[in-house]
UniProtKB/Swiss-Prot annotation:
Lineage: Bacteria, Pseudomonadati, Pseudomonadota, Gammaproteobacteria, Vibrionales
Protein name: Arginine repressor
Protein family membership: Belongs to the ArgR family.
Species of the source: Vibrio campbellii (strain ATCC BAA-1116)
HAMAP family: Arg_repressor
GO cellular component: cytoplasm
Database matches in InterPro entries: Arg_repress, Arg_repress_C, Arg_repress_C_sf, Arg_repress_DNA-bd, WH-like_DNA-bd_sf, WH_DNA-bd_sf
Pfam entry (one): Arg_repressor_C
Transmembrane segments annotated in the record for this chain: none
PANTHER family assigned to the protein according to its UniProt record, in alphabetical order: ARGININE REPRESSOR (PTHR34471:SF1)
C-alpha cells in the first residue's frame, strides 16, 4: 500500500473514531488506532491530527470531557446565519432558484413560505439544497428575484 493510501486510511479511521466514540485523552485515541492496525501511530501524530481537523474537547451527555470534530462544512449550525447558507440565487422567466448548502433548502423555504403572497411568493418547493420559488401574477420574476436577493443580502 502506498503512503498516501495509508494516510487516507488513517484519516478515515481517525475521523470515524472521533464521531463514534468518546475519547477523553490522546492516549486513548492512540490505543484505538493501534487496535485498528495503525502500529506506527503515536501521541504527537494524534495531537497534530486533532489540530489539523479542528477537534475540540467538550462535555458529552455524561459530563465527561471528550474530543470531538466540528460539524462538517456546509451543515447548518445554531450559530449559522441564514445568509451564510445561501450559495446562489438566479432566475428565469418563470422561477427564482436558490442554491443552498446541503440540507439547508427546507429551512430557507419555510422562511420564504411564511412571507407568502404579500411578498409576491405564490409557492415554494424545496429539495435538499435547491429551492424553486414561483411569483404571484402581479409580481414579475425579476421583481421577486430582486426581493429575494435583498432579503438574503445576496450580491452574487
Amino acid at each position: 500500500m502506498r503512503n498516501s493510501e495509508k494516510q487516507d486510511n488513517l484519516v478515515r479511521a481517525f475521523k470515524a473514531l472521533l464521531k463514534e466514540e468518546s475519547f477523553g485523552s490522546q492516549g486513548e485515541i492512540v490505543d484505538a488506532l493501534k487496535q485498528q492496525g495503525f502500529e506506527s501511530i503515536n501521541q504527537s501524530k494524534v495531537s497534530r491530527m486533532l489540530t489539523k481537523f479542528g477537534a475540540v474537547r467538550t462535555r458529552n451527555a455524561k459530563m465527561e470531557m471528550v474530543y470531538c470534530l466540528p460539524a462538517e462544512l456546509g451543515v447548518p449550525t445554531v450559530s449559522s446565519s441564514l445568509r451564510e447558507l445561501v450559495l446562489d440565487i438566479d432566475h428565469n422567466a418563470a422561477l427564482v432558484v436558490i442554491h443552498t448548502g446541503p440540507g439547508a433548502a427546507q429551512l430557507i423555504a419555510r422562511l420564504l413560505d411564511s412571507l407568502g403572497k404579500s411578498e409576491g411568493i405564490l409557492g415554494v418547493v424545496a429539495g435538499d439544497d435547491t429551492i424553486f420559488i414561483t411569483p404571484t401574477m402581479p409580481v414579475s420574476t425579476e421583481q421577486l428575484f430582486k426581493s429575494v436577493c435583498e432579503l438574503f443580502e445576496y450580491t452574487g
